[in-house]
Amino acid sequence: MSDENNQPFFNIQRIYLKDMSLEQPNSPAIFLEQEMPSVEVEVDVKAERLADTVFEILVTGTVTAKVSDKVAFLIEAKQAGIFDIRNIPAEQIDPLVGIACPTILFPYLRSNIADAITRAGFPPIHLAEINFQALYEQRLAQIATQETGAGSAAHH
């Protein structure tokens, strides 16, 4: 085998909008409200191994806007990417799919959500940048806490 075949390889095969839904349960009355809506944003990352070196990474964004207790709109979008990752040490795969890949996908998700919100007749909402490194570390800490809790519960 040549050295070339053992070189670390990272390639984006495809980026696509996998799913999107928009609900406006209180339209058209909600458009007459004068109060500014409160906005809640949730982001989640999932990874699935499709083949030995191929992964689908999914970044899901959910935006809920409410005026008082009434939902103005709720939008959920799933931005996906297929990534070919080869000759990367096993311990580096998880951070790559949990940090680097979502960082690549997020601008597409943000753009699709902003576009859908304005097409729905609402003022644009631009999602802030997300620190996927911090999100990844937070997830690892949660897993460690759950495992510690499960381990101590088993000893009782």
Swiss-Prot record:
<dbReference type="GO" id="GO:0006457">
    <property type="term" value="P:protein folding"/>
</dbReference>
<keyword id="KW-0813">Transport</keyword>
<comment type="similarity">
    <text>Belongs to the SecB family.</text>
</comment>
<dbReference type="InterPro" id="IPR035958">
    <property type="entry name" value="SecB-like_sf"/>
</dbReference>
<dbReference type="Pfam" id="PF02556">
    <property type="entry name" value="SecB"/>
</dbReference>
<dbReference type="GO" id="GO:0051262">
    <property type="term" value="P:protein tetramerization"/>
</dbReference>
<keyword id="KW-0963">Cytoplasm</keyword>
<keyword id="KW-0653">Protein transport</keyword>
<dbReference type="GO" id="GO:0015031">
    <property type="term" value="P:protein transport"/>
</dbReference>
<dbReference type="InterPro" id="IPR003708">
    <property type="entry name" value="SecB"/>
</dbReference>
<dbReference type="GO" id="GO:0005737">
    <property type="term" value="C:cytoplasm"/>
</dbReference>
<dbReference type="GO" id="GO:0051082">
    <property type="term" value="F:unfolded protein binding"/>
</dbReference>
<keyword id="KW-0811">Translocation</keyword>
<protein>
    <recommendedName>
        <fullName>Protein-export protein SecB</fullName>
    </recommendedName>
</protein>
<keyword id="KW-0143">Chaperone</keyword>
<comment type="subunit">
    <text>Homotetramer, a dimer of dimers. One homotetramer interacts with 1 SecA dimer.</text>
</comment>
<comment type="function">
    <text>One of the proteins required for the normal export of preproteins out of the cell cytoplasm. It is a molecular chaperone that binds to a subset of precursor proteins, maintaining them in a translocation-competent state. It also specifically binds to its receptor SecA.</text>
</comment>
